[in-house]
Amino acid sequence: MPTRKSVTPRKPGRPCPNGGVVILVLLSLGLAALPAACAAGPGSGVAAITPLVKSRDEWRRLLPPERFDILFEEGTERAGTSPLNEEKRAGSFVCAACFLPLFESKEKFNSGTGWPSFSDFIPGSLETKHDYRLFTPRTEYHCARCGGHQGHVFDDGIPPTGKRYCNNGLALVFVPAGEPLPALRQ
């Protein structure tokens, strides 16, 4: 009878952190978590983000109603209504719920859509899921720390990524370069 060989898949030149622990966790999760397990951690250049868990009622108490609707009810603000569309200063855009930095101003571009748009994000700051609420499936993205809905990503952006992260302005807070970032919400 052939024996099974234990192999830890990894990206070339990048070892998977905590190999033995990762294998045990992956076996219990059906190997579905392998890409994420090897993408972050020691040697990856991406810091692990500790999730911020709050109930919907807690978020409702902390946020103005229009921000809560977008961030935790997956609402969308009207196109052209966000002052962040015109923001051109150097700085960072952070999640309006938990204050995790999501985008740098150097990635912002005018997409002509009426929403703040970015060609790339800070590594590890966003997660995605499929959104089937319209006739055509879309990819929704949200803050990796608090799960707050930010917007949708499309393949009609500018080089070098070709991506357009189309963000609700109310889901972001702009922090000008040289000013301290807000402390992460606890």
Q: Across the structure, where does each feature detected by a protein language model lie?
A:
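Short N-terminal segments immediately surrounding and downstream of signal-peptide cleavage
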Residues: P42-E58
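A short Gly-Trp-Pro
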Residues: T50-P51, R60-V94, F99-Q186
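N-terminal secretory signal peptides that target proteins for export/translocation
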Residues: M1-P17
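N-terminal non-cleavable signal-anchor helices
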Residues: T8, V22-L26, C95
